[in-house]
Amino acid sequence: HIALPDFSSGAMENWGPMTYRETAMLANAKSSLSSKRQIALVIAHETAHQWFGNLVTMRWWDDLWLNESFATMMEYLAADSFYPDWNIWEEFAVNEAILSLRRDAIDGVQSVHIPVHHPDEIGTIFDGAIVYAKGARLMNMLRNYVGEEAFKSGLANYFEKFAYQNTVGDDLWRALSAASGKDVASFMESWLKQPGYPVVEADYDNGKLKLSQSQFFIGEGKNKKRVWPILLNANNPNIPKILDEKSIMVEL
């Protein structure tokens, strides 16, 4: 890790010596806790790229999320393991998330996975609110969906199999599916390839619960046909684990 006094980027995950702007890496006894937290997150993010991006690299830029979404999630995992008293996951729930939710609720926003047809388009896809912030929270949702042990095992197998190679998202899905026994590709497809996010409405009447999903949207242009597989947590066995239809009716 090398701190540079004059560096245009905040940090860069070079394959070997990672470089940082001094303010993104250096702290002292007088530094505020918020500065130390930010430095820890940046260092963890760039270190995560040694696996997500360097050891295994996406085949083409439409899978940029393989690098950035995972590295953004891993920065919080790493910081929490070193400094559990920081309660960094509380920050994960709000830091950048509000920006992402606002950005993702308007027309014209890109999806996490977006086709790139020409090198001139590459610079336009580095959307911090979507590929980084939203993508990281989707990866954390996936971690909860497959389970911690299956997630770790699947990643270990993925890195071992594809070390020093290029991959696509489906390669990772197959590794996580093999480790968890779940169809990860089907679960993640609409989350990655559709812009926006859903809101769930619950209506209860005479012992019946109706759950309906629709896209949360601000303004005109709402797509009423979009559906996401939404994880549900409930103490009633009649309520399914996943809502993957526009609406369902449940007897309680």
Enumerate the predicted regions with their spans.
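Hydrophobic alpha-helical and helix-loop surface patches within well-folded domains
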Residues: 1-221
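Long, His/Glu/Asp-enriched segments that create or flank divalent metal/ion-associated functional microenvironments
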Residues: 199-252
